[in-house]
């Protein structure tokens, strides 16, 4: 969006800032329900916990879509970026997280600039949505486990430590919560079952209040959002953990322009034409 370039450069007045990330949203979020879900998840990320970690100077992953780095912070670690290996295998995705941690480990800050905002294409199909989340989860596990093993994580502020650790153990904590709820607390009556679903949906709505302030109508997709969050936190993350060293982009192919579910035909072409004319 207008002003991104000017705004994203502002934090570099501090010589200790090595990387700056921007706020991001889904392009044409209303063109598909899975884009709405993705935009909700992105909004929660960039309205809530990324600014908090950025204020502390340690965003654990400056998203590669619009990451800006200080040149002198990148050049010394370039070889480690281009030749990343995990458990003996060369990594071909997840370079944004890798570079973020290399810069953090070099003593620089990684921050967030909310006034710089970019729109990005996201998948319009459930299949592509799932594959994208699998790739992101694999990248996160490799990146964060490396940060833990090398000791980089322990030198970051508390809020970054606790956020990264929470991301790593989400399948365990959510799995145990649902197991306890179903097998120890669930009263198999209509009221009991309704209460459980109401708790799941209401809880997700409270956690997404920042998105609902901007998009009140998203309350209508709250059940779909709750399903997507459980899907990502449990089966997808569990599968990604077990296959974290399986390399691949999943949503992009050599014989294809653009990612799966991200072609021009998935957009509202009338809106695109109006924006081009404008």
Model-derived features with residue positions:
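C-terminal, non-catalytic tails of nucleotide-sugar-dependent glycosyltransferases
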Residues: 139-155, 237-244
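Non-transmembrane catalytic domains and loops of membrane-associated enzymes and transporters
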Residues: 1-150, 277
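Alpha-helical membrane-protein architecture signal
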Residues: 126, 130, 154-161, 220, ...
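Charge-rich, acidic-biased intrinsically disordered regions
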Residues: 155-164, 229, 251-260
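Cytosolic juxtamembrane C-terminal amphipathic helix followed by a basic/polar low-complexity tail immediately after
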Residues: 248-278
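Short juxtamembrane and helix-loop transition motifs at transmembrane-helix boundaries
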Residues: 149-160, 184-188
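Loop-to-transmembrane boundary segments
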Residues: 19, 155-166, 267-273
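Membrane-embedded multi-pass helical conduit in multi-pass membrane proteins
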Residues: 162-248
């Amino acid at each position: 969006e207008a002003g991104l370039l000017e705004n994203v450069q502002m934090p570099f007045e501090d010589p200790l800032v090595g990387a700056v990330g921007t706020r991001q949203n889904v392009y044409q979020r209303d063109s598909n329900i899975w884009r709405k879900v993705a935009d909700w998840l992105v909004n929660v990320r960039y309205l809530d916990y990324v600014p908090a970690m950025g204020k502390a100077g340690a965003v654990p992953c400056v998203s590669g879509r619009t990451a800006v780095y200080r040149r002198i912070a990148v050049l010394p670690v370039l070889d480690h970026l281009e030749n990343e290996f995990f458990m003996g295998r060369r990594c071909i995705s997840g370079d944004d997280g890798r570079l973020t941690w290399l810069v953090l480990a070099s003593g620089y800050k990684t921050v967030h600039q909310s006034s710089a905002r970019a729109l990005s294409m996201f998948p319009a199909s459930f299949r592509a949505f799932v594959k994208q989340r699998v790739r992101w989860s694999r990248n996160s596990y490799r990146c964060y486990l490396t940060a833990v093993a090398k000791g980089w994580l322990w030198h970051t502020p508390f809020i970054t430590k606790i956020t990264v650790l929470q991301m790593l153990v989400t399948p365990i904590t959510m799995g145990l919560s649902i197991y306890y709820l179903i097998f120890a607390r669930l009263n198999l009556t209509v009221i009991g079952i309704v209460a459980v679903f109401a708790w799941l949906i209401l809880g997700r709505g409270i956690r997404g209040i920042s998105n609902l302030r901007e998009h009140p109508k998203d309350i209508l997709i709250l059940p779909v959002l709750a399903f997507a969050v459980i899907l990502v936190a449990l089966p997808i993350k569990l599968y990604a953990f077990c296959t974290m060293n399986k390399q691949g982009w999943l949503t992009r192919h050599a014989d294809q322009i653009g990612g799966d579910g991200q072609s021009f035909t998935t957009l509202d072409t009338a809106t695109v034409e109006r924006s081009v004319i404008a």
